């Protein structure tokens, strides 16, 4: 019986040593993850970062683009309720795709990723994020209308 107990103890010790050795070997193989980038802590910081990455148009620039590039898609990312209430910028190629559904609906609306697109919202808070998203999706000619729909209306420019 003593031999049997001794054999079990020896077997347990061997198993523990093998597990420890294996764990020791794994620690050499495992590489710690790279340091995570600094987190952006405010929504405004996200908007500012998107604005820095995306070309911007003011009202005069948008008017010029609509005149010289009539194929430009004007993309309103406000909610349908906002558009129903106040209208939208008059443009030959207009789409209203809510910011939250943009990634899922843009390819059906604008399949050619080289199409010029100008994105806007009410006060240029959602549109920079949307324009940045379009660029990340591979759209190559995207701009943000930084003055927003509110300033377009104040200027008395055409709405539908």
List PLM regions with ranges.
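Rhodanese-like catalytic fold shared by cysteine-dependent sulfurtransferases
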Residues: 2, 8, 19, 23-71, ...
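Sec-dependent N-terminal signal peptides
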Residues: 7-14
């Amino acid at each position: 019986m003593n031999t049997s107990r001794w054999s079990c103890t020896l077997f347990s010790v061997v198993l523990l040593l093998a597990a420890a050795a294996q764990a020791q070997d794994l620690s050499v193989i495992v590489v710690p993850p790279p340091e995570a980038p600094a987190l952006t802590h405010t929504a405004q910081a996200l908007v500012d970062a998107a604005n820095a990455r995306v070309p911007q148009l003011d009202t005069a620039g948008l008017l010029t683009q609509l005149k010289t590039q009539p194929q430009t898609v004007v993309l309103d990312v406000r909610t349908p309720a906002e558009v129903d209430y106040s209208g939208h910028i008059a443009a030959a190629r207009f789409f209203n795709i809510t910011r939250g559904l943009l990634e899922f609906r843009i390819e059906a609306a604008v399949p050619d990723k080289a199409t010029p697109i100008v994105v806007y919202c009410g006060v240029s808070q959602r549109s920079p994020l949307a324009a940045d998203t379009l660029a990340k999706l591979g759209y190559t000619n995207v701009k943000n209308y930084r003055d927003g729909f509110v300033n377009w209306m104040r200027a008395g420019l055409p709405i539908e």
